[in-house]
């Protein structure tokens, strides 16, 4: 808001004119006093006769000067009275009223300026507070967004770790089940191995019994062969080294259990279709290969 400041003349032209008149009157009075004062004069012996007339003249002149001075003083007093009356008249003149109106307008303008400055200051304060609140909200929003991003990343990491933990738990369960299966299989194999071991021990015991049973037969056959001669040797050989009771082609080398008949060859003894002994028709539980080479 632009305010045009008017320079007010606190002293009117009438004040200046009266002051100049008083000043000129004073100068004139001073000039008359200086003119009436005279100059110093040097008087000799020859001129002593003129002193008395001069003194008398001076006395008369001083009386005239005093009279004129009193007149001037009275004139000055009258002029001062007239000037004071004029000043009083000027104080209540329309010009003084105009000056008072100007002063009131200036005061009003100053009050308006102060009010405008106060209003602008309040507006600026409100704007600064609003801007500060906006910046505070923006900062809080930025901090909140950063915190939310970090929390979201942590939540995603927690979910990922939970999935990984679930996968590991499933893997542990599978490993546990697999371990249990392998343990059961190991126990089954161990039981099978123990059963096979016991069966093998039984077979070995039966083989020992078979060897003990064959030894007297072989000795008797040898004795019979030595006593009967070469004509009866074929029959003894057929008894001792008889062929397979099933195919009749190969030499019997498989002992059938539990009847203990040595009546099958290697091929027939390995067949899964043979379930009974071909000699006594007893159910065959096992078979043992016998090495007939001497």
Swiss-Prot record:
Segments of this protein annotated with the region WRD domain: 168-204
Cleavable signal peptide: none
Catalytic reaction list: S-ubiquitinyl-[E2 ubiquitin-conjugating enzyme]-L-cysteine + [acceptor protein]-L-lysine = [E2 ubiquitin-conjugating enzyme]-L-cysteine + N(6)-ubiquitinyl-[acceptor protein]-L-lysine
Induction: Up-regulated by salt and salicylic acid. Down-regulated by gibberellic acid and methyl jasmonate. Not regulated by pathogen or 1-aminocyclopropane-1-carboxylic acid (ACC).
Family matches, as CDD domains: mRING-HC-C3HC5_CGRF1-like
Pfam families linked: zf-C3HC4_3 (PF13920)
GO molecular function, one term: ubiquitin-protein transferase activity
Major enzyme class: transferase
Keywords: Coiled coil, Metal-binding, Plant defense, Transferase, Ubl conjugation pathway, Zinc, Zinc-finger
GO biological process, one term: regulation of programmed cell death
EC number(s) per entry: 2.3.2.27
Knockout-associated phenotype: No visible phenotype. Decreased resistance to B.cinerea and increased cell death upon pathogen infection. Boi, brg1, brg2 and brg3 quadruple mutant shows a higher GA signaling resulting in a higher seed germination in the presence of paclobutrazol, precocious juvenile-to-adult phase transition and early flowering.
InterPro entries referenced in this protein's UniProt entry, alphabetically: Znf_RING, Znf_RING/FYVE/PHD
Coiled coil location: 183-212
Zinc finger RING-type: from-to: 244-281
Pathway per the UniProt entry: Protein degradation; proteasomal ubiquitin-dependent pathway
Function: E3 ubiquitin-protein ligase involved in regulation of abiotic stress responses. Not involved in ubiquitination of MYB108/BOS1. Has no effect on the stability of the DELLA proteins.
PANTHER family referenced in this protein's UniProt entry, alphabetically: BOI-RELATED E3 UBIQUITIN-PROTEIN LIGASE 1, SBP (S-RIBONUCLEASE BINDING PROTEIN) FAMILY PROTEIN
Quaternary structure annotation from Swiss-Prot or TrEMBL: Interacts with the DELLA proteins GAI, RGA, RGL1, RGL2 and RGL3.
Domain notes from UniProt: The RING-type zinc finger domain mediates binding to an E2 ubiquitin-conjugating enzyme.
Protein name (database record): BOI-related E3 ubiquitin-protein ligase 1
